Amino acid sequence: MKGYWVVAVQDVLKPDAWGQVLSAFENYVEESDGICKPISFAPPAAVYESGISKTTAVIEFPSLDDAVHARTRDSSYFQRVIEADGTPVENKAIRDFRIIETEGGWMKPGHGYWLVWVREFIDKDNWIGKVMPAWQEYVASDACKVHHLKPPHMALEDGRMFPFALCEFPSLQAAIDARESDEYNKDVLGAAGKPVHEMVTRDFRIIEG
């Protein structure tokens, strides 16, 4: 099992200062001797619901402990990277920053991935009671491979302790087609008979491996 930062940038408040953060992060990665390994760091290929077309970062660490340590206790990161200008990271960018644990090796070149950050529950009863059972049937049909679907180990900055979903498809196009399919939109999301945005707010992004 490995640890991951899964980060959805919501907004960049100070582009110049944030650009300096990104440059410093590149140096941090180089100096980490492979401990900190970005496996995706770009805007998503597609967004849905409350998804935002801003940087979507997946950073791999050898273990969950390494991922937590790097973000919370490594001064090389929070002093020399995100707070190098002497101000909190929140002054420069708003990020839904979560730390999760899952098996390594899931990111495969050419495959497509749903990365979904639940930001808020509005009608949790219908979501859990009706939509999630339909989702389980959808997954059981081999529609996709689920690598993570639960709250994170830790949430920081603008992160939330709500479920984070990581689902794999054979290709980017397959991931997009699945998101736009009747099987997902009607049979799963429509299981409660009400619009998704009346039950849950999700930052839904699709990326390519």
Residue ranges and their predicted role:
Residues M1-T72, K92-D182, R202-G209:
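Short S/T/G/P-rich N-terminal loop/turn motif that feeds into the first structured element of a domain
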